[in-house]
Regions:
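Detector for outer-membrane/organellar transmembrane beta-barrel domains
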Residues: 120-121, 137-139, 144-180
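Disordered, low-complexity tails and leader-like regions
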Residues: 18, 69, 81, 89-90
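A mature extracytoplasmic/lumenal domain signature
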Residues: 32-34, 65, 75-79, 87-88
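Solvent-exposed loop/turn segments connecting transmembrane beta-strands
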Residues: 6-10, 104-108, 131-140, 161-167
Length: 180
């Protein structure tokens, strides 16, 4: 009889992304996901926790209000959707640990937000999101972010305020020239 508590886990994720634009400056995003990490003890959101059946995990519409501002609205989105800041030079989802009790965690629920986005300059975002299928006093998250994005460096300050926890995060990155 083995008393070892070690184990090997293999997880996978299937993802289908559909992007549609009506005006060229907007984006209707639908993402279908499935995977086998539903009961994984790893507790990471990097693999799908949607179960074996293909389901819609993201459904949102992002559009420009004018030259400086954009808005986002949708019935299913992660906390990082619609935030204008750039926390890393690489994969934003991994860098901000979305899906745990961190700065952009709100689960997969409805949300609405507004952002001032600049590819080279100051950014700001305000978003109201939910970790449930509806927005109410128990499930509401207020996610705010300010950031600076330049060609070789940047960062963000992000807050997530709700009834269960308040999270505050600071992220910076430097990407030297001639570095992948």
């Amino acid at each position: 009889e083995s008393t070892s508590s070690e184990s090997l886990h293999f997880t996978y994720e299937n993802k289908i992304r559909l992007n549609t634009s009506f005006k060229g400056t907007d984006n209707l995003l639908t993402v279908f996901e499935s995977g086998n990490a539903l009961d994984s003890p790893l507790m990471l959101d990097l693999q799908s926790k949607k179960g074996d059946n293909l389901k819609i995990s993201t459904l949102l519409y992002k559009f420009q209000l004018n030259d400086e501002y954009e808005a986002i609205i949708g019935p299913k989105m992660f906390g990082y959707h619609g935030l204008a800041g750039k926390s890393t030079a690489y994969n934003e989802r991994i860098a901000i640990l979305d899906g745990s009790n961190y700065t952009t965690s709100s689960g997969i629920g409805p949300g609405i937000g507004i952002s001032k986005r600049k590819k080279n300059g100051l950014n700001a975002s305000f978003k109201i999101a939910s970790d449930s299928s509806q927005i109410d006093n128990e499930s509401i998250h207020f996610i705010n972010q300010i950031g600076l994005t330049k060609k070789n460096f940047g960062g963000t300050i992000t807050t997530n305020l709700n009834n269960d926890f308040d999270a505050y995060g600071i992220a910076t990155f430097i990407k030297p020239k001639n570095f992948p």
